[in-house]
Amino acid sequence: MKATELKDKSVEELNTELLNLLREQFNLRMQASTGQLEKTDQIRKVRRSIARVKTILTQKAAA
């Protein structure tokens, strides 16, 4: 998801998105540790999406 799309969302929606991403990150880590994950770049994409959401949340809190 792009940062411009995230800026339009409310804080509650961003928190929900963050929880979903954290769950997805956990699942991907488990798949990677058991050798089931074929597309290892997904972990990096999810990690960066988490960073985007946290950045937008911080910006909204400061505003």
From Swiss-Prot:
Keywords: Ribonucleoprotein, Ribosomal protein. One of its GO terms (cellular component) is cytosolic large ribosomal subunit. InterPro entries: Ribosomal_protein_uL29, Ribosomal_uL29, Ribosomal_uL29_sf. NCBIfam families: L29. Belongs to the universal ribosomal protein uL29 family. One of its GO terms (molecular function) is structural constituent of ribosome. One of its GO terms (biological process) is translation. The keyword Ribonucleoprotein applies. Pfam families: Ribosomal_L29. CDD domains: Ribosomal_L29_HIP. This is Large ribosomal subunit protein uL29.
